[in-house]
């Protein structure tokens, strides 16, 4: 039985969907993100529009509703770098390939923007996420940073992007 799902780029009008998925993510894994439930629930529609505007967001849709999201944002000082952020997949779809589809979309977007590297941060000790990103071709860089809001250590990971023609899955091994 195949899962009916699609990953699509978020557009104006998707603010309430992004908000709903982001709040689910923060309820499910409050320590995994740089923000808090309290901060995100207070965001207005205009805040969500601004959140989408400097980069890109993708939503994973299934018949049961939105089940995941991810965002990509160009680095402010280095145009060759795109940051993968706000990655989350609903617990019921983990291990089914949905998270892979979200990451592949950010990689494809980064490639189309001319980026050479996709970079992310993962909380130290979140081995499931780290292993997932390693499977997607990311490697730790040795850079670590203490998150100010709670003292958690964030480990930086990145992967280079091959600019050859073809789909983003072709270079998943890094």
Positions of predicted regions on the chain:
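Extreme N-terminal starter segment of soluble prokaryotic enzymes
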Residues: 4-7
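Acetyl-CoA-dependent GNAT
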Residues: 9-92, 103-105, 109, 144-146, ...
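Short polybasic/polar patches that bind polyanions
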Residues: 94, 111, 134
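Conserved acyl-CoA
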Residues: 101-117, 139
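C-terminal "cap" of GNAT-fold acetyltransferases
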Residues: 116-117, 123-130, 134-174
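Active-site acidic-Proline motif in GNAT/NAT acetyltransferases
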Residues: 90-96, 124-125
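Alpha-helical macromolecular-interaction surfaces
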Residues: 17, 97, 101, 105, ...
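Conserved phosphate-binding and hydrolysis motifs of nucleotide-dependent enzymes
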Residues: 68, 97-99, 137
């Amino acid at each position: 039985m195949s899962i009916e799902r699609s990953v699509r780029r978020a557009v104006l009008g998707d603010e309430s969907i992004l908000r709903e998925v982001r709040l689910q993510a923060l309820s499910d894994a409050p320590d995994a993100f740089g923000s808090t439930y309290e901060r995100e629930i207070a965001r207005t529609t205009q805040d969500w529009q601004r959140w989408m505007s400097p980069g890109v967001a993708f939503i994973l849709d299934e018949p049961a509703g939105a089940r995941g999201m991810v965002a990509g944002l160009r680095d402010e000082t280095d145009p060759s770098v795109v940051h993968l952020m706000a990655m989350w997949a609903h617990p019921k779809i983990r291990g089914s390939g949905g998270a892979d589809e979200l990451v592949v979309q950010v990689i494809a977007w980064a490639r189309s923007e001319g980026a050479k590297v996709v970079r992310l941060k993962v909380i130290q000790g979140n081995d499931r996420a780290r292993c997932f990103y390693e499977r997607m071709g990311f490697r730790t860089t040795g850079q670590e940073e203490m998150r100010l809001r709670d003292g958690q250590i964030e480990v930086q990971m990145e992967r280079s992007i091959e600019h050859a023609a073809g789909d983003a899955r072709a270079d998943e091994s890094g």
